[in-house]
Structures are given as structure tokens and as C-alpha cells.
């Protein structure tokens, strides 16, 4: 029996979502590699690059700038939650946040140092922070990034800014955020 289009779409999403139950320290690199291989060609949130291109571009730019390994790895893995989230991937039609930063951090925290996990967990907060503290930053955001910002709570309040500034990894998180923003170059 042929599947209906809707049933086929549900089936595809189920087989595309990675199985994280059996991930361990011996297979985490293969697990991440398989995500890039299987899903890296997916659209990146209304941008003109794929998800894989976006993540690799950020890491490549960090490496070319001679950043430390934790920044390079943070830039590479910051959006891994788009692939591991129970809620699926973001689209421009979304009306609710999908919390990909939390989904990614939940996987990474078992295998990577806290700084890597923090770069994933707080890169959305970093965008909200930069929008609240630097008006020029907001002006540079893409249409897709503004859309996701609105779903993610908009610019931080003054109270949120003060709380976020207490994070001991603030500088590195903000650095990864800037590579996140930069990694959207078609044909790089």
C-alpha cells in the first residue's frame, strides 16, 4: 500500500531523528558525523545555506581566526539540537520556539567540556543579549534570525542581561554567537 503524503512525511521525520539512547563516549564522534552526513543538506532556517554548511562555516571561520579549540568545536556543534530535538527543526512558518539549544546541550553535556555545552545551550541567549545591549547587532540580523529571535523571547530585559553577564563563559559564548551569525555565506 502506498503511504499517504502526510504519513510519508511523518515516517521520514521519524527515521531522520537520530537515536540518542545508545550514544556513548566511544561512538559520539560517529554519531555526530552521521548527523552531518544524513541531515547536513537540510535547509537552514530560511537562510541561503544548508544546516551543514552553516555549522561548518562557523567552525571554519573560527579556525581561520586561530580561535582555541573550544570555540571551533562550539561553533561546529552549536546548532546540533536542530537534529536532536524532540520538537523537530525550525521553519519560517513556526509560531513557537523549538528549544534546539536545550536539545543540543542535553546530548553534548555527557561527552564534551562545559564550555562546549554552554556555547550550545546559550547561543540563543547570546543573540537575545546582543540585541538588548548592541542596537547595531539587531540591524545585522537576517530575516530568519529576527523571526527566530521573536519566537525565542526577543531582546533580553535588563534583569536578564545582568543575570546572563554572570555566566563565567560569557565571552566565549558571545564569540561563538558571532561565528553563528557569520556562517551564512552561500557558495563559501
Language-model regions: role of each:
Residues 15-188:
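Metal-dependent phosphohydrolase cores
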Residues 1-14:
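Single conserved hydrophobic/aromatic residue that forms the stacking wall/gate
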